[in-house]
Amino acid sequence: PAALIGVAEKGYMSVVLRLSATPGHSSMPPPKGTSAIAMLSAALKRLEDEQLPGGIRGVAAEMFDTLAPEMGGFSRVALSNLWLFGPLVQKQLEGAASTNALLRTTTALTIVNAGNKENVLPGRAEATVNFRLLPGDTKDGVLQHMRGQVSQAAPQDRFELFALPGAVEASKVAPTDSAQYRALNQTIREVFPDALVAPGLMVAGTDSIH
């Protein structure tokens, strides 16, 4: 078993993406890709496909550095030699939701709203996208990334972005060479002598960020 001491917590931001187009009737749809729903769909696909870059760095790197010597087989070899096996390990970690969240600011498409009648083309379509910010990334950086991706799918005068209230930056990373970390480390080892103790990243949101 492994016991992870949380040394940082990811940030939180939800952004509303709103697309506008000329409303109309479904009997005479506009040119391909120009309706509000079509542009929103293209923008969301781009945000899903072109997420913020990930990597084994920061808290994740420190966690694997700590755990690697205690592992066996190829896992020990790979995690102890990320300079060589880094791309392979990263691809493997990105394949699972729980470990992918350790490597990057995640993008989650959570709400979509558009239209209210089956034969009417709406003049507006919007979606909410939730981001969990990795330490080192910022709210402004995420908005810039999002704006850049959406502008590849829709004209800039057809969309707007705004962050919902309650957004918070990622926490600072607590040092692992502090007296507090050493005390927690020692206590955990005394209570759970078989556990591997390592620094960890809290990928969800808690009151601890305050």
For each feature predicted by the language model, list its residue ranges:
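Solvent-exposed, non-transmembrane alpha-helical starts
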Residues: 29-30, 137-142
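A short core secondary-structure module
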Residues: 27-52
